[in-house]
C-alpha cells in the first residue's frame, strides 16, 4: 500500500489524480463533444470574411458610354453616395450597360446594405431615362469573385434561343433560389425575341419613316386591363386579341395605307424569330452554348451552396428535353475539397510524426501512449468549441490544428518527463505523479498563457486580414488551452496508473542504444555550456548579432501578401483593337480557343464575347480555362499560364491576359490581372493626358508584367452634328433625331410579348446588311411639320471621331485602373515600390489621386501593421510573464530568445525562394510563442534550485540546462515535426500552407541550437546586474 503525500502535494492536479474514473469520464465527454461538433462543422476553403458587396446593373441598349454615364450611372451614384457604411463605390459605363459595384464595411450586415441599396434605387428612379427597358437590378454578389460553378447547355437539335428560354425558366430560376446563391447569369445572348429589320429603301420609296412603323407596332401590341361586365346574375371578364405572339403575326401587321392599299410590316421589313441581342455569344470549348455561371453571396459557404445545387441538378436536367445537354464544366468545390483533404492528411501525418518522436525520446510504450492520447483529445475537443463559435473546417483552421500537434504534446511531455524522473529516483508512481505534477504545474501555466498571449494581437488585427486569421488564432488558442487542461488532469492520472520503475527500466536494444546516444549528447552539451559560460560577452555578442541579422533580413527579404494558389481554374481576358466589330471579335476568340484547347493541361474552356454588364466592350472577351486535376497534369498553374500566353501571342490582333482563380477575393472589379493601381481625377481630359504616360513607364519596369489599363478612348464614333436652325424651320426636334437614330441602329426594344411563363421583346433596327458602315446614316428619314419626308443628311453632317468605349468612376469621380502581374523573380513588395517610384518621377498634378486596389491595398495595410503586430505580441507576452514571475527581469531573459527564431525563419524563407507574406508572418509570430518555452523550462528550474536548495545562480542554471535538455529537445522536435508536413506539402493548396511550415521549421532549428547557450548566459548577466543594483540601492531594497 502506497503512503500518500500530504494533501498539499500535487496542486490542482491532485483531485484528478486521486479520482481516475471521474477524470476519465470527463475526458470522454470532451472527446464525444468534439466528435459531435466535427459532424456539424461546415467545410470551406478559407474563413468567410467577404466584404458585403452589391452589384447594380442597368441595361440601356443602344446608348453610348457618355449617355449611360450621365443619364444612368451619375444619378444612381449620387443616391448611393449618401448611404451609411459604404466603403467604396466603383462603376463602369459602357455601350448599353451601367454597372455600379458597392462595397460596404465589414461590420454592416449584407441584408441591411441590401435595404439601403433598394431605397437609393427608388429615390433615383425619377431621374433615370423614361424609356429604360427595365429598372436597375441589384445582386448580392461580388463581380470579381469567380463563379463557384459553371455549366454549359448545348443542343444539336434545338435553336439556342429556345434552349436559353427553357434553361432560364426551368433551371436558372430554381438555382437562384438556393440559399447562398447571389447571382445566376446566362451568357450567350440567345434570349428569344421578334426582330424587325427595316428595309430603308422600301420605307423611303413609300414615304414612311421608322418612327411611323415603331408607333404602329407599339400601338398594335398591348396588354392592359379592359374591365368586366357586372350583370344582375353574373359577371363577365373582358379580353381581346390585343397581343401578337409570333413573327408571322407581326409580319401581317398593317403599318400604313397608301392610295387605299394596306402596307404591311412584311412589305417594308424582314420579321423573324431571333435573339434579343445579336452582339452576344458564348462557347463551351468550340461549341456554341448557353453558359450558366453561378456566383455566391458574400459570406455564403461555397461547399454548402454547391452541394445544394448538385443535389437539385438531376431533377432540373430531367425537366429538359433529351436533346438538351447540360454539363458541369467547373466546380470550385472540387479543388477546395482536395485542398482540405490534403491538409487533413498532413494533420494526421503530423500526429504520427509527433508520436514517433515521443517514443524515440521516451523509449517506453506506456510513456508514449500517455502524450499520444493527449494529442487527439486536445484536437478533437477543439471541434466542439469551433461549432459554438460558428467556425468552419478550412485550410487555416486545419493548419492551426496541424501546428497545434507539436504544441499540445509539449505540456504532456514536460509532465511525463518530470514524473518519470521521480519514479526513476525510487518514488512510487502515485507519489511521483502528485509531486511531479505539483512541481511542474506553474511551468505548464506559464507555457500555456505566454503562448496564448502571442495570439492575442491576431484577434485585434483590423480589416479583412484580421477577420481571416481570427479563426486560426482562436482555434490554436483553444487547442493549447485544452492541452494544458489535459496535461494537468489526465496526463498525471495516467502516469500514476501506467508508469512504474520496472516499465521505465525495461530496455531493449533500441532503447539502450538511444539512451547511450542521449547521454553522450547531454555530456557534450554540458562541456560546451561550461565553455560558453566562461565567455559570456562573446555569447552576448552572438545574441546581439542575431538581433541585427534579423533586422537586416527583414529589410531585404522579398515581401508578398497572400500566396498565389493553384486552384485549377484560370480567368482570362482577350483584348483586341478598340474599333473591332462583334463578328471580327468572335472570329479572333475562336482562333484563340483553338490554341488553348491544344494545351495538354487544359480540360475545358468557356468563352464569351459582347457587352452585357459583365463584359465592358465589344473588343473584350472573357475566358475561363479549367485545368485538369493537379495529379493529371505535369505543370502548375503559373507554368501553364506562361505557356498559353506564349502560344496565343502568335495569333494576330489580340492580347491575352490570364490570372489563376484564388480562394481569397478582395477586389470588386473584374481585372485582367492579379493586381491593380487606380488613377482618379476630376475630369476625363486629365486622365487622357497622364494614363498613357504612366502605362508606358510601368511597361518598362522589370518588376511588372502584363501591364495594361482599362482606359479605352480610341473607339470609333460617328458624331451627328445637327443644324438646329434648319431642323427647327422644318419642325424637327432633337428628340425626333434621337428617336430616328435609335430606331435604326440601337436594337431598340419597342414592345413586349407577354406569355404565361416569360416575357419577350420586339426589337427594331435597320437592316444594316444592305447599307453597311457610315453609309447607313444616309438611309435615316424624318418627318417634317408639313408631313414631308426629310433625309438626315438635309439637316446634319456626320464626322468620324474617337470616343471612349467605357467610362469608369471610383467614388463618383472619373478613374482608370492599371492592371499588372508580378514576374516570378520579383515580389509584390518590389512591384509596389517600383510603381510608387515611377509615379514620383511623373510628378502628377494635384487633381489626380492614386491608390492601389484590392489585394495590393490590403498588402500595404498588412505590411504597415506587421511590425506593430510583432511588437504587440512581444509586449503581451512580457506582461503575462511579468505577472507570472512577479519580476521585471526574468521576462526579458525569456524574450531574449526571440531574435534567434526570426533569423532562422527569415533565412529558411529566403533559401527556399519564398516571400515574407501574411502566412509566413503568422508563422514568425507563433515562433515567438514557441521558442521562449526553452528559456521558461530552464529559468523555472534554476529559480527553484536557488530558492529551495540554496544553489548559486551559475550552478542552478547549469543544472537546469542539463536536467531540462531532454524535454527541451523533445518538445522542440515535436513542434518541428508538427510543422514539417506543411513545409513538405505538395498537393492542392500547398502554396498556402508551405510558407507557414518553412518559417517554423527554420526558426525552430536555429533557435534550438542558439537558445541552449544564450539563455543561461543572459540569465547570469541579468542576475549579476540585479546584484549590483541591490548593492547600489540597499535602502530602497530594504524598504521594498
From Swiss-Prot:
SUPFAM superfamilies: Multidrug efflux transporter AcrB pore domain, PN1, PN2, PC1 and PC2 subdomains (SSF82693), Multidrug efflux transporter AcrB TolC docking domain, DN and DC subdomains (SSF82714), Multidrug efflux transporter AcrB transmembrane domain (SSF82866)
Coiled coil (UniProt feature): none
Lineage: superkingdom: Bacteria
GO molecular function: xenobiotic transmembrane transporter activity
InterPro entries according to UniProt: AcrB_DN_DC_subdom (IPR027463), Acrflvin-R (IPR001036), Multidrug-R_MdtB (IPR022831)
Similarity comment: Belongs to the resistance-nodulation-cell division (RND) (TC 2.A.6) family. MdtB subfamily.
Subunit details: Part of a tripartite efflux system composed of MdtA, MdtB and MdtC. MdtB forms a heteromultimer with MdtC.
Name the UniProt record assigns to this protein: Multidrug resistance protein MdtB
Taxonomy of the source species: Bacteria, Pseudomonadati, Pseudomonadota, Gammaproteobacteria, Enterobacterales
Amino acid at each position: 500500500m502506497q503512503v500518500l503525500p500530504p494533501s498539499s502535494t500535487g496542486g490542482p492536479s491532485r483531485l484528478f489524480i486521486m479520482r481516475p474514473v471521474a477524470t476519465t469520464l470527463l475526458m470522454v465527454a470532451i472527446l464525444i463533444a468534439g466528435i459531435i461538433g466535427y459532424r456539424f462543422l461546415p467545410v470551406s476553403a478559407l474563413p468567410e470574411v467577404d466584404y458585403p458587396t452589391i452589384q447594380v446593373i442597368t441595361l440601356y441598349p443602344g446608348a453610348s458610354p457618355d449617355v449611360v454615364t450621365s443619364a444612368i450611372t451619375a444619378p444612381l451614384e449620387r443616391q448611393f453616395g449618401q448611404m451609411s457604411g459604404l466603403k467604396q463605390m466603383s462603376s463602369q459605363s459602357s455601350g448599353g450597360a451601367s454597372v455600379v459595384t458597392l462595397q460596404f464595411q465589414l461590420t454592416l450586415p449584407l441584408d441591411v446594405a441590401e435595404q439601403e441599396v433598394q431605397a437609393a434605387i427608388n429615390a433615383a428612379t425619377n431621374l433615370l431615362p423614361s424609356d429604360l427597358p427595365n429598372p436597375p437590378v441589384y445582386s448580392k454578389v461580388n463581380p470579381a469573385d469567380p463563379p463557384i460553378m459553371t455549366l454549359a447547355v448545348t443542343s444539336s437539335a434545338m435553336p439556342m434561343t429556345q434552349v436559353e428560354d427553357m434553361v432560364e425558366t426551368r433551371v436558372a430560376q430554381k438555382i437562384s433560389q438556393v440559399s447562398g446563391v447571389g447571382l445566376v447569369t446566362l451568357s450567350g445572348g440567345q434570349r428569344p425575341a421578334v426582330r424587325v429589320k427595316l428595309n430603308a429603301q422600301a420605307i423611303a420609296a413609300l414615304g414612311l419613316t421608322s418612327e411611323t412603323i415603331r408607333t404602329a407596332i407599339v400601338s398594335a401590341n398591348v396588354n392592359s386591363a379592359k374591365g368586366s361586365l357586372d350583370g344582375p346574375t353574373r359577371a363577365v371578364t373582358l379580353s381581346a386579341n390585343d397581343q401578337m405572339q409570333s413573327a408571322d403575326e407581326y409580319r401581317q401587321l398593317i403599318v400604313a395605307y397608301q392610295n387605299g392599299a394596306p402596307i404591311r410590316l412584311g412589305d417594308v421589313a424582314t420579321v423573324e424569330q431571333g435573339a434579343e441581342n445579336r452582339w452576344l455569344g458564348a462557347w463551351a470549348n468550340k461549341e456554341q452554348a448557353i453558359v450558366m455561371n453561378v456566383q455566391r453571396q458574400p459570406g455564403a459557404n461555397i461547399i454548402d451552396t454547391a452541394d445544394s445545387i448538385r443535389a437539385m441538378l438531376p431533377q432540373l436536367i430531367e425537366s429538359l428535353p433529351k436533346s438538351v445537354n447540360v454539363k458541369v464544366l467547373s466546380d470550385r468545390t472540387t479543388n477546395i475539397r482536395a485542398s482540405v483533404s490534403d491538409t487533413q492528411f498532413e494533420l494526421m501525418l503530423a500526429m504520427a510524426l509527433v508520436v514517433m518522436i515521443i517514443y524515440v525520446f521516451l523509449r517506453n510504450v506506456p510513456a508514449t501512449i500517455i502524450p499520444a492520447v493527449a494529442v487527439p483529445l486536445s484536437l478533437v475537443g477543439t471541434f466542439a468549441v469551433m461549432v459554438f463559435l460558428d467556425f468552419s473546417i478550412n485550410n487555416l483552421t486545419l493548419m492551426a490544428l496541424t501546428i497545434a500537434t507539436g504544441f499540445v504534446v509539449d505540456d504532456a511531455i514536460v509532465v511525463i518527463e518530470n514524473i518519470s524522473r521521480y519514479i526513476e529516483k525510487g518514488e512510487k508512481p502515485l507519489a511521483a505523479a502528485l509531486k511531479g505534477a505539483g512541481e511542474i504545474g506553474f511551468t505548464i501555466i506559464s507555457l500555456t498563457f505566454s503562448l496564448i498571449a502571442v495570439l492575442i494581437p491576431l484577434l485585434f488585427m483590423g480589416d479583412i486580414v484580421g477577420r481571416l486569421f481570427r479563426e486560426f488564432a482562436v482555434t490554436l488558442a483553444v487547442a493549447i488551452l485544452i492541452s494544458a487542461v489535459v496535461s494537468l488532469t489526465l496526463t498525471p492520472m495516467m502516469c500514476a496508473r501506467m508508469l512504474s520503475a520496472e516499465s521505465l527500466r525495461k530496455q531493449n536494444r533500441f532503447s539502450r542504444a538511444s539512451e547511450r546516444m542521449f547521454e553522450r549528447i547531454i555530456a557534450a552539451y554540458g562541456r560546451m555550456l561550461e565553455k560558453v559560460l566562461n565567455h559570456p560577452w562573446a555569447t552576448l555578442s552572438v545574441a546581439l548579432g542575431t538581433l541585427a541579422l534579423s533586422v537586416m533580413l527583414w529589410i531585404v527579404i522579398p515581401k508578398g501578401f497572400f500566396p498565389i494558389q493553384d486552384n485549377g481554374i484560370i480567368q482570362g481576358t482577350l483584348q483586341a483593337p478598340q474599333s473591332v466589330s462583334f463578328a471580327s471579335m468572335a472570329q479572333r476568340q475562336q482562333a484563340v480557343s483553338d490554341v488553348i484547347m491544344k494545351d495538354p493541361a487544359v480540360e475545358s474552356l468557356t468563352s464569351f464575347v459582347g457587352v452585357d454588364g459583365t463584359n465592358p466592350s465589344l473588343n473584350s472577351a472573357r475566358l475561363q480555362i479549367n485545368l485538369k486535376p493537379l495529379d493529371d497534369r505535369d505543370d502548375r498553374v503559373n507554368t501553364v499560364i506562361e505557356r498559353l500566353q506564349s502560344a496565343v501571342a502568335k495569333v494576330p490582333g489580340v492580347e491575352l491576359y490570364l490570372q489563376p482563380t484564388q480562394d481569397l477575393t478582395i477586389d470588386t472589379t473584374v481585372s485582367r490581372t492579379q493586381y491593380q493601381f487606380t488613377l482618379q481625377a476630376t475630369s476625363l481630359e486629365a486622365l487622357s493626358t497622364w494614363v498613357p504616360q504612366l502605362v508606358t513607364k510601368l511597361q518598362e519596369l522589370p518588376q511588372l508584367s502584363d501591364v495594361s489599363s482599362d482606359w479605352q478612348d480610341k473607339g470609333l464614333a460617328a458624331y451627328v452634328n445637327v443644324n438646329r436652325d434648319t431642323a427647327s424651320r422644318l419642325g424637327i426636334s432633337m428628340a425626333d433625331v434621337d428617336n430616328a437614330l435609335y430606331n435604326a441602329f440601337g436594337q431598340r426594344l419597342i414592345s413586349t410579348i407577354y406569355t404565361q411563363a416569360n416575357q419577350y421583346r420586339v426589337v427594331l433596327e435597320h437592316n444594316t446588311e444592305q447599307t453597311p458602315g457610315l453609309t447607313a446614316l444616309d438611309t435615316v428619314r424624318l418627318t417634317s411639320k408639313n408631313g414631308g419626308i426629310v433625309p438626315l443628311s438635309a439637316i446634319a453632317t456626320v464626322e468620324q471621331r474617337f470616343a471612349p468605349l467605357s467610362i469608369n468612376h471610383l467614388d463618383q469621380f472619373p478613374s482608370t485602373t492599371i492592371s499588372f502581374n508580378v514576374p516570378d523573380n520579383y515580389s509584390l513588395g518590389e512591384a509596389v515600390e517600383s510603381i510608387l517610384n515611377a509615379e514620383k518621377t511623373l510628378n502628377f498634378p494635384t487633381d489626380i489621386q492614386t491608390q492601389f486596389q484590392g489585394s495590393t491595398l490590403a498588402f500595404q495595410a498588412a505590411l504597415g501593421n506587421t511590425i506593430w503586430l510583432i511588437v504587440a505580441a512581444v509586449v503581451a507576452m512580457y506582461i503575462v510573464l511579468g505577472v507570472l514571475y512577479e519580476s521585471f527581469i526574468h521576462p526579458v531573459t525569456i524574450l531574449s530568445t526571440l531574435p534567434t527564431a526570426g533569423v532562422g525563419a527569415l533565412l529558411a524563407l529566403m533559401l527556399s525562394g519564398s516571400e515574407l507574406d501574411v502566412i509566413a508572418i503568422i508563422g514568425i509570430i507563433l515562433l515567438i510563442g514557441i521558442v521562449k518555452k526553452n528559456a521558461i523550462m530552464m529559468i523555472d528550474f534554476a529559480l527553484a534550485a536557488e530558492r529551495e536548495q540554496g544553489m548559486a545562480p551559475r550552478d542552478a542554471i547549469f543544472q537546469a540546462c542539463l536536467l531540462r535538455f531532454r524535454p527541451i529537445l523533445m518538445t522542440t522536435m515535436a513542434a518541428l515535426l508538427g510543422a514539417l508536413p506543411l513545409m513538405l506539402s505538395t498537393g492542392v493548396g500547398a502554396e498556402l500552407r508551405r510558407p507557414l511550415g518553412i518559417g517554423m521549421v527554420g526558426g525552430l532549428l536555429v533557435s534550438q541550437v542558439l537558445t541552449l547557450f544564450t539563455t543561461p548566459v543572459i540569465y547570469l548577466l541579468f542576475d549579476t546586474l540585479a546584484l549590483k543594483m541591490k548593492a547600489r540601492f540597499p535602502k530602497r531594497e530594504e524598504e521594498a
